[in-house]
Amino acid sequence: MALATGLGASPAAADPRRGLVTYVLVHGTHSAGAFWTPIARELVLRGHRVVMVDQPRHGAEAFVAESYQRQDLTAMAVEPSPLKGLGLADYEARVTGIVRQAARNGPVVLVGHSLGGVSVSRVGDAVPHLLHHICYMAAFCPSRALPTADACTAAPENANAVSPVELTVGDPDRLGVLRLNFRTGVSGELALLKEMICADYPDADFRRILAGMQTDEPVAAYAGRAVGRLGTWGRVPRTYLRFGRDRTIATALQDRMIAEADASTPGNCFRVHDFPGASHVGPLDPTPVADVLDTLAGRG
């Protein structure tokens, strides 16, 4: 089995592989498909196919601002971004295309982390018949009351989350992106980033996580509506991986999103797996998360 980044499973896959589950893994904000590598490796070693999606202009297509490379913050505040104008329709199209290809070879389990949850909901609406299971890993799951990632973030249940607003470079409205400087050398900014992303990680692992982060995320992705419809998204079996020390999507907000989703589809509620010590990026050891994801292959 092979790992892929941003590419669907081959439609020419041999018949003996047909029926095996493909996991389609969707990264979160300011990230890339490579975020999933430790978990994907575990799943592949257990006999599954895995696709680690790169959303448009992320990962292998990443935009690296010239000013970011040389750490010129004045220039970085105004350098145009090709991510401006991208939105959830683009993200949905990317993931849906991969799901369509993967589904030719067998069942698909779609998993989203963080902002990747809004793509899971949109794709669940678009192609529910192609999805064996959907999973939100400390991810946004919008509802009628909280229809966007922005609305979820602003909910009172997210009050104890760490906001990156003071790390923002430039004007998001003018740039069309939320731009963050992950190469900062300012100790206070690094401490804020660590608390937001992975407070429980050793510093060396924190720096490794930062090295994979991308400066720009389009503001339209946060503002796009992603409420699953009852007759489409609402009929796909679903799981939530709840992280108890998340300072980006607070645990109380995760609980509210789970409760509102379950209230909308009482006959198809979340199966919740609790990781009480996990920060936003999840446990440093990928095995416990992979253990849960592995079980989804057999669940309808």
Tell where the protein language model's regions lie, with residue ranges.
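Conserved hydrolase catalytic core segment
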Residues: 106-150
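Conserved strand-to-loop "acid loop" that flanks and positions the catalytic carboxylate
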Residues: 239-246
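Catalytic active-site module of serine/aspartate enzymes centered on a nucleophile-bearing elbow/loop
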Residues: 264-300
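The conserved beta1-alpha1 loop
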Residues: 24-30, 54, 113, 242
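N-terminal export signals
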Residues: 1-13
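Conserved alpha/beta-hydrolase "acid-adjacent" motif
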Residues: 247-257
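Flexible "cap/lid" loop of the alpha/beta hydrolase fold
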Residues: 135-179
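Conserved alpha/beta-hydrolase
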Residues: 40-78
